[in-house]
Every structure is written in structure tokens, then in C-alpha cells.
């Protein structure tokens, strides 16, 4: 086996919803020699219950008055993700996403994402797993916090 180990820079939502910061983080990761940068895509109104979405989020680190607003402000639009994908190509690094819901998975697949990650909290979300499997692309599945039965 001659496959090289792939190094992934986990950006997640550390960009804080700031497009230019995301680009800076991608470039910094590339300069460190990574093969991939990974972020996260979710639709807060899909992932959260109405109660969770509307819960007051009173924190010095909050990006909104409610938890849902906070999460919305950490998300980029599809157009922004497409621009970030082009930027990744320009700096010669690959980009992929952890997806948390079917809507996000579909959007990222239509955008041409070549690899997907399913986070530990979604390992039992069979509808999401089936959907991402249907894309016929590589999938990384985290299993932290999962029992052997869940996996």
C-alpha cells in the first residue's frame, strides 16, 4: 500500500461566521502542509427544535440573542461555500464538510463536495447516513461517544 497519510485541518466553526477569517484559516492550514481543510455545515432550523432555536443565549461569546440566531450567524450561504471551494482550489488544498442534516448534505453534494464526514452525534441518524451513502463518495464517520451497538 503506497497511500500517503492525509492531514486534515479542522476549522469547524472557528471562523465565527467571518468569511475573511475562514479564508485566512484555510491559507494558514495550507501553509502548514495539510491536504484538507474541514468545516461544518448545518441548517439550524432543521437541527434544532423550536424550543432550542428560540432559547435565550446570553453569553459574551454569542452571535445572536437566541441559540438559533447564534447558530445561524455561524453559517455561510451556499454561494459563500462555493466561493470558498474555489479559493481552496486556488491555494491547492481540498475542502470537505461535516454535515449535520439532510438539507446540508444535499447542498454540499450539489456543490461538488468529494468527501463527507459524519460527526459522532449523528452516527445513529440513519436517514443522514443513507443519504450521504447514496452520493457514492468517501465518508468519514466519527464514533466517539458511540456504543458498539450504535456503530
Model-identified regions with their sequence ranges:
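N-terminal small/glycine-rich loop or linker at the start of catalytic domains
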Residues: 1-16, 56, 63-67, 82-83
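Catalytic domains of carbohydrate-active enzymes, especially glycoside hydrolases
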Residues: 24-43, 111-112
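Conserved anion-binding
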Residues: 44, 124-151
Amino acid at each position: 500500500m503506497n497511500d500517503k497519510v492525509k492531514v486534515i485541518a479542522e476549522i469547524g466553526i472557528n471562523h465565527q461566521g467571518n468569511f475573511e477569517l475562514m479564508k485566512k484559516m484555510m491559507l494558514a492550514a495550507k501553509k502548514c502542509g495539510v491536504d484538507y481543510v474541514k468545516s461544518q455545515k448545518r441548517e439550524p432550523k432543521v437541527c434544532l427544535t423550536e424550543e432550542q432555536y428560540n432559547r435565550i443565549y446570553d453569553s459574551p461569546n454569542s452571535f445572536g440573542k437566541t441559540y438559533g440566531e447564534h447558530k445561524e450567524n455561524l453559517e455561510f450561504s451556499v454561494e459563500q461555500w462555493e466561493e470558498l471551494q474555489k479559493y481552496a482550489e486556488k491555494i491547492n488544498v481540498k475542502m470537505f464538510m461535516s454535515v449535520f442534516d439532510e438539507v446540508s448534505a444535499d447542498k454540499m453534494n450539489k456543490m461538488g463536495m468529494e468527501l463527507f464526514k459524519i460527526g459522532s452525534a449523528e452516527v445513529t441518524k440513519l436517514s443522514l447516513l443513507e443519504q450521504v451513502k447514496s452520493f457514492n463518495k468517501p465518508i468519514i464517520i466519527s464514533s466517539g461517544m458511540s456504543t458498539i451497538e450504535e456503530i
